[in-house]
Amino acid sequence: MAAEHLIRFAAGRSKIRVWDAGCARGQETWSLAMILAERMNQYGFRNLKIDATDHDSQNHFGAVVTQGTYSFRELERTPRHLVERYFRTLYDGGREFCQVIELLRQKVTYHYHDLLSLRPVGGNYCLILCKNVLLHLQYEERVAVYRMFHEALTPGGYLATEQTQKLPPEVAHLFEKAVPDAQLFKRVEQLAGRLNQQSVNTISGGTER
């Protein structure tokens, strides 16, 4: 669902940036990359860049995501036709495993990143994914991270979170629901609201004088 909204939103853009915040071993990152490779036109996919990040102090995930290597068991839930199209089979010391093809690997960059730094890894993202991370944060931390995501999104960009994670009321004015049955939100711009409030204040001030 997030991919379909991204494709429509990003049509004609020269830069299409996606941030997978909390990518773990990268399965979600590559699933999204495969979906976009299947459904985007050639121009759009050429302009796609995905930042995959995780707070992985033991560096368990970086090499896995960068190399895109997985066992067949890890890909059991991936549709067979996608595995055949976007993975190649490799052998190492009698061990058989799969590697994401170069076409997709060149679209993804892994970064070590702590969401609680409240410093975005980049900016002007058309889509930010954050699944199975926010639920581990304290309430005040979640509010701060949502504000950071709003800052990192391009105007009108999308934020997708886990289905069980509700938007805190403190940041409800920063996002609007894109669909009724999923946690997919669209960035709301604040400029118009500020200008309207300034106009109200000016009118009120003039009346009092």
Question: Can you annotate each of these PLM segments?
Answer:
Residues 1-19:
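Conserved AdoMet
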Residues 4, 8, 38, 117, ...:
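Active-site micro-motifs of SAM-dependent methyltransferase domains
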Residues 25-43:
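Conserved SAM-binding loop of SAM-dependent methyltransferases across substrates and taxa
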Residues 43-129, 133-136, 141, 167:
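Extended basic-aromatic, gly/pro-enriched interface segments that bind polyanionic ligands
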Residues 56-61, 86-90, 96-102, 112-122, ...:
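Class I (Rossmann-like) S-adenosyl-L-methionine-dependent methyltransferase catalytic domain
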Residues 143-155:
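A short glycine-rich, Lys/Arg-flanked "PGG" loop and its adjoining helix->strand segment in the class I
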